[in-house]
Protein backbone atom coordinates (compact mmCIF):
# COMPACT_ATOMS: atom_id res chain seq x y z
CA UNK A 1 0.00 0.00 0.00
CA UNK A 2 3.01 2.24 0.42
CA UNK A 3 3.68 1.87 -3.28
CA UNK A 4 0.09 2.91 -4.09
CA UNK A 5 0.45 5.95 -1.93
CA UNK A 6 3.68 6.83 -3.68
CA UNK A 7 1.96 6.52 -7.06
CA UNK A 8 -0.86 8.81 -5.95
CA UNK A 9 1.65 11.34 -4.78
CA UNK A 10 3.39 11.16 -8.12
CA UNK A 11 0.09 11.79 -9.94
CA UNK A 12 -0.58 14.83 -7.88
CA UNK A 13 2.89 16.10 -8.72
CA UNK A 14 1.95 16.20 -12.40
CA UNK A 15 3.21 12.83 -13.73
CA UNK A 16 0.12 11.30 -15.40
CA UNK A 17 2.08 8.57 -17.13
CA UNK A 18 2.72 6.65 -13.97
CA UNK A 19 5.91 5.05 -12.70
CA UNK A 20 8.00 2.20 -13.97
CA UNK A 21 10.21 -0.47 -12.49
CA UNK A 22 9.56 -1.46 -8.92
CA UNK A 23 6.33 0.52 -8.69
CA UNK A 24 4.74 -1.70 -11.37
CA UNK A 25 5.70 -4.86 -9.54
CA UNK A 26 4.33 -3.54 -6.26
CA UNK A 27 0.75 -2.94 -7.43
CA UNK A 28 -1.68 -4.45 -4.92
CA UNK A 29 -3.68 -7.52 -6.03
CA UNK A 30 -6.94 -5.79 -5.37
CA UNK A 31 -5.94 -2.88 -7.59
CA UNK A 32 -5.22 -5.28 -10.45
CA UNK A 33 -8.56 -7.03 -9.94
CA UNK A 34 -10.45 -3.84 -10.67
CA UNK A 35 -9.46 -4.07 -14.35
CA UNK A 36 -6.97 -2.33 -16.56
CA UNK A 37 -6.24 1.27 -15.94
CA UNK A 38 -6.93 4.02 -18.40
CA UNK A 39 -3.94 5.14 -20.46
CA UNK A 40 -3.60 8.28 -18.37
CA UNK A 41 -3.95 6.52 -15.03
CA UNK A 42 -1.33 6.69 -12.37
CA UNK A 43 -0.09 3.16 -12.69
CA UNK A 44 1.30 1.39 -15.72
CA UNK A 45 -1.31 -0.04 -18.09
CA UNK A 46 -1.41 -3.69 -19.16
CA UNK A 47 -3.02 -2.92 -22.54
CA UNK A 48 -0.89 -3.02 -25.72
CA UNK A 49 -1.37 0.73 -26.23
CA UNK A 50 0.17 1.63 -22.88
CA UNK A 51 3.56 3.23 -22.45
CA UNK A 52 5.13 -0.13 -21.66
CA UNK A 53 6.03 -2.74 -24.29
CA UNK A 54 3.09 -4.72 -25.64
CA UNK A 55 2.63 -8.36 -24.59
CA UNK A 56 0.92 -9.36 -27.87
CA UNK A 57 2.85 -11.91 -29.96
CA UNK A 58 3.09 -9.59 -32.97
CA UNK A 59 4.30 -6.56 -31.05
CA UNK A 60 7.92 -5.63 -31.71
CA UNK A 61 8.47 -3.01 -29.10
CA UNK A 62 6.94 0.18 -27.77
CA UNK A 63 3.45 1.00 -28.93
CA UNK A 64 3.01 3.27 -31.95
CA UNK A 65 -0.43 4.58 -31.01
CA UNK A 66 -0.68 8.38 -31.22
CA UNK A 67 -1.82 8.87 -27.62
CA UNK A 68 1.08 7.13 -25.94
CA UNK A 69 4.21 8.72 -24.66
CA UNK A 70 6.29 7.52 -27.65
CA UNK A 71 6.75 9.73 -30.72
CA UNK A 72 3.65 10.11 -32.85
CA UNK A 73 3.49 8.90 -36.47
CA UNK A 74 0.63 11.14 -37.51
CA UNK A 75 1.39 13.74 -40.21
CA UNK A 76 0.93 16.63 -37.77
CA UNK A 77 3.32 15.20 -35.24
CA UNK A 78 6.77 16.52 -34.52
CA UNK A 79 8.43 13.98 -36.85
CA UNK A 80 9.31 14.87 -40.45
CA UNK A 81 6.26 15.22 -42.64
CA UNK A 82 5.80 13.40 -45.97
CA UNK A 83 3.36 15.93 -47.36
CA UNK A 84 4.45 17.67 -50.57
CA UNK A 85 4.76 21.06 -48.91
CA UNK A 86 6.54 19.86 -45.81
CA UNK A 87 10.16 20.60 -45.04
CA UNK A 88 11.10 16.95 -44.78
CA UNK A 89 12.07 16.49 -48.46
CA UNK A 90 9.31 16.93 -51.01
CA UNK A 91 9.07 14.68 -54.06
CA UNK A 92 7.08 17.13 -56.12
CA UNK A 93 8.79 18.39 -59.31
CA UNK A 94 9.15 21.94 -58.04
CA UNK A 95 10.22 21.11 -54.52
CA UNK A 96 13.69 21.65 -53.19
CA UNK A 97 14.11 18.06 -52.05
CA UNK A 98 15.07 16.63 -55.49
CA UNK A 99 13.33 17.54 -58.72
CA UNK A 100 11.93 14.93 -61.09
CA UNK A 101 12.24 17.20 -64.09
CA UNK A 102 14.55 15.83 -66.83
CA UNK A 103 18.00 17.36 -66.72
CA UNK A 104 20.79 17.20 -69.32
CA UNK A 105 23.14 14.28 -68.97
CA UNK A 106 26.28 15.40 -67.18
CA UNK A 107 28.43 13.33 -69.51
CA UNK A 108 26.87 14.99 -72.56
CA UNK A 109 27.44 18.45 -71.11
CA UNK A 110 31.04 17.63 -70.24
CA UNK A 111 31.89 16.50 -73.78
CA UNK A 112 30.46 19.56 -75.57
CA UNK A 113 33.74 21.56 -75.67
CA UNK A 114 35.51 18.59 -77.26
CA UNK A 115 32.99 17.59 -79.94
CA UNK A 116 35.05 18.91 -82.84
CA UNK A 117 38.24 17.35 -81.50
CA UNK A 118 36.51 13.98 -81.10
CA UNK A 119 35.07 14.18 -84.60
CA UNK A 120 38.46 15.06 -86.07
CA UNK A 121 40.08 12.19 -84.17
CA UNK A 122 37.50 9.61 -85.27
CA UNK A 123 37.81 10.68 -88.90
CA UNK A 124 41.59 10.38 -88.72
CA UNK A 125 41.29 6.87 -87.26
CA UNK A 126 38.87 5.62 -89.89
CA UNK A 127 41.21 6.79 -92.67
CA UNK A 128 44.27 4.92 -91.39
CA UNK A 129 45.18 2.16 -93.84
CA UNK A 130 46.12 -0.23 -91.05
CA UNK A 131 42.53 -0.08 -89.79
CA UNK A 132 40.94 -0.49 -93.23
CA UNK A 133 40.28 -3.82 -95.01
CA UNK A 134 41.41 -4.30 -98.58
CA UNK A 135 38.66 -3.65 -101.10
CA UNK A 136 39.55 -6.69 -103.22
CA UNK A 137 40.99 -9.00 -100.57
CA UNK A 138 39.00 -11.94 -101.96
CA UNK A 139 41.02 -11.94 -105.19
CA UNK A 140 44.30 -10.59 -103.85
CA UNK A 141 44.63 -12.52 -100.58
CA UNK A 142 42.14 -15.39 -100.56
CA UNK A 143 42.75 -16.42 -104.15
CA UNK A 144 39.10 -17.15 -104.82
CA UNK A 145 38.82 -19.74 -102.02
CA UNK A 146 36.43 -17.39 -100.22
CA UNK A 147 34.06 -15.35 -102.37
CA UNK A 148 31.78 -12.52 -101.38
CA UNK A 149 28.70 -14.73 -101.35
CA UNK A 150 30.36 -16.89 -98.72
CA UNK A 151 31.26 -13.73 -96.83
CA UNK A 152 27.61 -12.63 -96.93
CA UNK A 153 26.51 -15.97 -95.50
CA UNK A 154 29.09 -15.67 -92.73
CA UNK A 155 28.04 -12.12 -91.81
CA UNK A 156 24.40 -13.17 -91.85
CA UNK A 157 25.16 -16.03 -89.46
CA UNK A 158 27.11 -13.65 -87.21
CA UNK A 159 24.08 -11.33 -87.11
CA UNK A 160 21.97 -14.28 -86.01
CA UNK A 161 24.44 -15.17 -83.23
CA UNK A 162 24.53 -11.55 -82.07
CA UNK A 163 20.73 -11.61 -81.85
CA UNK A 164 20.75 -14.86 -79.86
CA UNK A 165 23.26 -13.45 -77.37
CA UNK A 166 21.48 -10.06 -77.29
CA UNK A 167 24.66 -8.22 -78.23
CA UNK A 168 24.84 -4.52 -79.03
CA UNK A 169 24.85 -3.29 -82.63
CA UNK A 170 28.35 -1.95 -82.04
CA UNK A 171 29.56 -5.45 -81.19
CA UNK A 172 28.34 -6.88 -84.50
CA UNK A 173 29.88 -4.05 -86.52
CA UNK A 174 33.23 -4.42 -84.76
CA UNK A 175 33.19 -8.19 -85.31
CA UNK A 176 32.52 -7.86 -89.06
CA UNK A 177 35.32 -5.30 -89.28
CA UNK A 178 37.69 -7.74 -87.56
CA UNK A 179 36.78 -10.46 -90.06
CA UNK A 180 37.39 -8.23 -93.10
CA UNK A 181 40.66 -6.89 -91.74
CA UNK A 182 41.89 -10.36 -90.79
CA UNK A 183 41.05 -11.83 -94.20
CA UNK A 184 42.88 -8.88 -95.78
CA UNK A 185 46.15 -10.06 -94.23
CA UNK A 186 46.22 -13.85 -94.45
CA UNK A 187 44.82 -16.63 -96.62
CA UNK A 188 42.31 -18.52 -94.55
CA UNK A 189 40.68 -21.92 -95.14
CA UNK A 190 37.02 -21.63 -96.05
CA UNK A 191 35.97 -24.52 -93.82
CA UNK A 192 37.01 -22.57 -90.70
CA UNK A 193 35.12 -19.36 -91.41
CA UNK A 194 32.62 -20.14 -88.67
CA UNK A 195 35.48 -20.31 -86.17
CA UNK A 196 36.70 -16.92 -87.40
CA UNK A 197 33.24 -15.34 -87.16
CA UNK A 198 32.59 -16.80 -83.72
CA UNK A 199 35.92 -15.62 -82.35
CA UNK A 200 35.50 -12.16 -83.88
CA UNK A 201 32.22 -11.82 -81.99
CA UNK A 202 33.96 -13.04 -78.84
CA UNK A 203 36.70 -10.39 -79.16
CA UNK A 204 34.20 -7.65 -79.99
CA UNK A 205 31.98 -8.55 -77.04
CA UNK A 206 34.96 -8.23 -74.71
CA UNK A 207 35.58 -4.76 -76.06
CA UNK A 208 31.99 -3.51 -76.22
CA UNK A 209 29.74 -5.44 -73.82
CA UNK A 210 29.44 -4.88 -70.07
CA UNK A 211 28.87 -8.60 -69.46
CA UNK A 212 30.28 -10.48 -72.47
CA UNK A 213 29.28 -14.11 -72.98
CA UNK A 214 31.76 -16.73 -71.82
CA UNK A 215 34.00 -18.50 -74.30
CA UNK A 216 32.00 -21.67 -73.62
CA UNK A 217 28.91 -19.98 -75.04
CA UNK A 218 30.71 -19.16 -78.27
CA UNK A 219 31.99 -22.71 -78.49
CA UNK A 220 28.49 -24.06 -77.95
CA UNK A 221 27.00 -21.81 -80.65
CA UNK A 222 29.05 -23.75 -83.21
CA UNK A 223 27.35 -26.92 -81.93
CA UNK A 224 30.70 -27.68 -80.27
CA UNK A 225 32.38 -27.97 -83.66
CA UNK A 226 35.19 -25.91 -82.16
CA UNK A 227 36.45 -26.24 -78.61
CA UNK A 228 37.11 -23.42 -76.19
CA UNK A 229 40.84 -23.95 -76.73
CA UNK A 230 40.43 -23.44 -80.49
CA UNK A 231 38.40 -20.27 -79.92
CA UNK A 232 41.04 -18.92 -77.51
CA UNK A 233 43.85 -19.69 -79.98
CA UNK A 234 41.91 -18.00 -82.78
CA UNK A 235 41.45 -14.99 -80.50
CA UNK A 236 45.23 -14.63 -80.18
CA UNK A 237 45.66 -14.90 -83.95
CA UNK A 238 43.07 -12.19 -84.61
CA UNK A 239 44.60 -9.81 -82.08
CA UNK A 240 48.09 -10.41 -83.44
CA UNK A 241 47.13 -9.75 -87.06
CA UNK A 242 45.09 -6.68 -86.07
CA UNK A 243 48.01 -5.43 -83.98
CA UNK A 244 45.53 -5.20 -81.08
CA UNK A 245 43.74 -2.29 -82.79
CA UNK A 246 40.22 -3.36 -81.87
CA UNK A 247 38.72 0.07 -81.22
CA UNK A 248 38.46 1.43 -84.74
CA UNK A 249 35.35 3.54 -85.45
CA UNK A 250 32.54 1.77 -87.29
CA UNK A 251 29.37 2.82 -89.10
CA UNK A 252 27.46 2.71 -85.81
CA UNK A 253 30.06 4.97 -84.17
CA UNK A 254 29.35 7.78 -86.63
CA UNK A 255 25.65 7.01 -86.92
CA UNK A 256 25.15 7.54 -83.18
CA UNK A 257 26.97 10.85 -83.45
CA UNK A 258 24.98 12.01 -86.50
CA UNK A 259 21.63 11.11 -84.95
CA UNK A 260 22.52 12.94 -81.75
CA UNK A 261 23.65 16.03 -83.66
CA UNK A 262 20.73 16.50 -86.03
CA UNK A 263 17.88 14.52 -84.47
CA UNK A 264 18.16 14.97 -80.73
CA UNK A 265 15.20 14.02 -78.55
CA UNK A 266 13.16 10.96 -77.69
CA UNK A 267 9.95 11.46 -79.65
CA UNK A 268 8.46 8.70 -81.79
CA UNK A 269 9.61 10.10 -85.13
CA UNK A 270 13.23 10.23 -83.99
CA UNK A 271 12.89 6.72 -82.61
CA UNK A 272 11.68 5.47 -85.99
CA UNK A 273 14.54 7.22 -87.73
CA UNK A 274 17.04 5.61 -85.37
CA UNK A 275 15.59 2.15 -86.00
CA UNK A 276 15.57 2.68 -89.75
CA UNK A 277 19.19 3.88 -89.78
CA UNK A 278 20.34 0.97 -87.62
CA UNK A 279 18.57 -1.45 -89.93
CA UNK A 280 20.19 0.07 -93.01
CA UNK A 281 23.58 -0.07 -91.29
CA UNK A 282 23.12 -3.79 -90.62
CA UNK A 283 22.12 -4.35 -94.24
CA UNK A 284 25.30 -2.64 -95.40
CA UNK A 285 27.35 -5.23 -93.53
CA UNK A 286 26.08 -7.99 -95.82
CA UNK A 287 27.32 -6.49 -99.06
CA UNK A 288 31.04 -6.31 -99.84
CA UNK A 289 30.37 -3.23 -101.98
CA UNK A 290 30.34 -1.02 -98.87
CA UNK A 291 33.84 -2.06 -97.77
CA UNK A 292 35.25 0.58 -100.13
CA UNK A 293 33.53 3.43 -98.27
CA UNK A 294 34.68 5.00 -95.04
CA UNK A 295 32.38 4.22 -92.09
CA UNK A 296 31.38 7.88 -91.80
CA UNK A 297 30.24 7.90 -95.44
CA UNK A 298 28.10 4.77 -94.96
CA UNK A 299 26.63 6.27 -91.78
CA UNK A 300 25.74 9.49 -93.62
CA UNK A 301 24.16 7.46 -96.42
CA UNK A 302 22.07 5.49 -93.90
CA UNK A 303 20.87 8.75 -92.37
CA UNK A 304 20.10 10.22 -95.79
CA UNK A 305 18.13 7.17 -96.99
CA UNK A 306 16.42 6.71 -93.62
CA UNK A 307 15.16 10.30 -93.47
CA UNK A 308 14.02 10.22 -97.09
CA UNK A 309 12.24 6.86 -96.67
CA UNK A 310 10.30 8.00 -93.62
CA UNK A 311 9.66 11.53 -94.93
CA UNK A 312 9.85 11.48 -98.75
CA UNK A 313 8.47 15.02 -99.04
CA UNK A 314 11.33 16.61 -97.14
CA UNK A 315 14.96 17.24 -98.01
CA UNK A 316 17.02 14.83 -95.88
CA UNK A 317 19.82 17.28 -95.16
CA UNK A 318 17.63 20.02 -93.71
CA UNK A 319 18.23 20.76 -90.03
CA UNK A 320 21.59 20.92 -88.27
CA UNK A 321 23.40 19.55 -91.30
CA UNK A 322 26.59 21.49 -90.62
CA UNK A 323 27.09 19.62 -87.35
CA UNK A 324 27.67 16.29 -89.10
CA UNK A 325 29.97 17.52 -91.85
CA UNK A 326 33.69 18.34 -91.77
CA UNK A 327 34.22 21.69 -89.98
CA UNK A 328 36.04 23.31 -92.93
CA UNK A 329 32.89 23.35 -95.08
CA UNK A 330 30.84 26.51 -95.05
CA UNK A 331 27.13 26.18 -94.50
CA UNK A 332 26.19 27.15 -98.06
CA UNK A 333 28.19 24.31 -99.61
CA UNK A 334 27.44 21.65 -97.03
CA UNK A 335 24.53 19.96 -98.75
CA UNK A 336 26.20 19.72 -102.15
CA UNK A 337 29.47 18.57 -100.58
CA UNK A 338 27.97 15.79 -98.51
CA UNK A 339 25.60 14.48 -101.18
CA UNK A 340 28.44 14.38 -103.69
CA UNK A 341 30.60 12.36 -101.30
CA UNK A 342 27.94 9.83 -100.39
CA UNK A 343 26.26 9.74 -103.81
CA UNK A 344 27.55 6.31 -104.86
CA UNK A 345 26.80 4.89 -101.42
CA UNK A 346 23.29 6.38 -101.39
CA UNK A 347 22.59 5.20 -104.93
CA UNK A 348 22.78 1.45 -104.12
CA UNK A 349 21.66 1.42 -100.49
CA UNK A 350 17.92 1.81 -101.26
CA UNK A 351 18.00 -1.08 -103.72
CA UNK A 352 19.75 -3.23 -101.12
CA UNK A 353 17.09 -2.16 -98.63
CA UNK A 354 14.24 -3.10 -100.98
CA UNK A 355 15.68 -6.42 -102.12
CA UNK A 356 16.79 -7.68 -98.73
CA UNK A 357 13.67 -6.64 -96.85
CA UNK A 358 10.91 -7.70 -99.23
CA UNK A 359 12.50 -10.64 -101.06
CA UNK A 360 12.83 -14.22 -99.85
CA UNK A 361 15.80 -14.91 -102.15
CA UNK A 362 19.47 -14.28 -101.49
CA UNK A 363 21.74 -15.08 -98.58
CA UNK A 364 20.13 -12.78 -96.05
CA UNK A 365 17.81 -14.00 -93.34
CA UNK A 366 16.77 -10.49 -92.37
CA UNK A 367 13.27 -11.75 -91.74
CA UNK A 368 14.83 -12.75 -88.41
CA UNK A 369 16.08 -9.24 -87.85
CA UNK A 370 12.59 -7.93 -88.54
CA UNK A 371 11.33 -10.09 -85.68
CA UNK A 372 13.50 -8.16 -83.25
CA UNK A 373 11.35 -6.14 -80.89
CA UNK A 374 12.70 -2.81 -82.08
CA UNK A 375 11.95 -3.59 -85.74
CA UNK A 376 8.32 -4.27 -84.86
CA UNK A 377 8.07 -0.58 -84.01
CA UNK A 378 8.90 0.34 -87.60
CA UNK A 379 6.07 -0.67 -89.97
CA UNK A 380 6.77 0.41 -93.56
CA UNK A 381 4.13 -0.58 -96.09
CA UNK A 382 5.24 1.26 -99.25
CA UNK A 383 8.93 2.14 -99.09
CA UNK A 384 10.03 4.97 -101.34
CA UNK A 385 12.59 4.17 -103.99
CA UNK A 386 15.23 6.84 -104.38
CA UNK A 387 16.08 7.24 -108.06
CA UNK A 388 19.43 8.35 -109.41
CA UNK A 389 17.96 11.69 -110.38
Swiss-Prot record:
<keyword id="KW-0132">Cell division</keyword>
<protein>
    <recommendedName>
        <fullName>Putative cyclin-F3-1</fullName>
    </recommendedName>
</protein>
<dbReference type="InterPro" id="IPR048258">
    <property type="entry name" value="Cyclins_cyclin-box"/>
</dbReference>
<dbReference type="GO" id="GO:0005634">
    <property type="term" value="C:nucleus"/>
</dbReference>
<feature type="compositionally biased region" description="Low complexity">
    <location>
        <begin position="19"/>
        <end position="43"/>
    </location>
</feature>
<dbReference type="GO" id="GO:0016538">
    <property type="term" value="F:cyclin-dependent protein serine/threonine kinase regulator activity"/>
</dbReference>
<dbReference type="InterPro" id="IPR036915">
    <property type="entry name" value="Cyclin-like_sf"/>
</dbReference>
<keyword id="KW-0131">Cell cycle</keyword>
<keyword id="KW-0195">Cyclin</keyword>
<feature type="region of interest" description="Disordered">
    <location>
        <begin position="1"/>
        <end position="103"/>
    </location>
</feature>
<dbReference type="GO" id="GO:0000082">
    <property type="term" value="P:G1/S transition of mitotic cell cycle"/>
</dbReference>
<dbReference type="InterPro" id="IPR006671">
    <property type="entry name" value="Cyclin_N"/>
</dbReference>
<dbReference type="GO" id="GO:0000307">
    <property type="term" value="C:cyclin-dependent protein kinase holoenzyme complex"/>
</dbReference>
<dbReference type="InterPro" id="IPR004367">
    <property type="entry name" value="Cyclin_C-dom"/>
</dbReference>
<dbReference type="InterPro" id="IPR013763">
    <property type="entry name" value="Cyclin-like_dom"/>
</dbReference>
<dbReference type="GO" id="GO:0005737">
    <property type="term" value="C:cytoplasm"/>
</dbReference>
<dbReference type="InterPro" id="IPR039361">
    <property type="entry name" value="Cyclin"/>
</dbReference>
<comment type="similarity">
    <text>Belongs to the cyclin family. Cyclin F subfamily.</text>
</comment>
<dbReference type="GO" id="GO:0051301">
    <property type="term" value="P:cell division"/>
</dbReference>
<dbReference type="Pfam" id="PF00134">
    <property type="entry name" value="Cyclin_N"/>
</dbReference>
<dbReference type="Pfam" id="PF02984">
    <property type="entry name" value="Cyclin_C"/>
</dbReference>
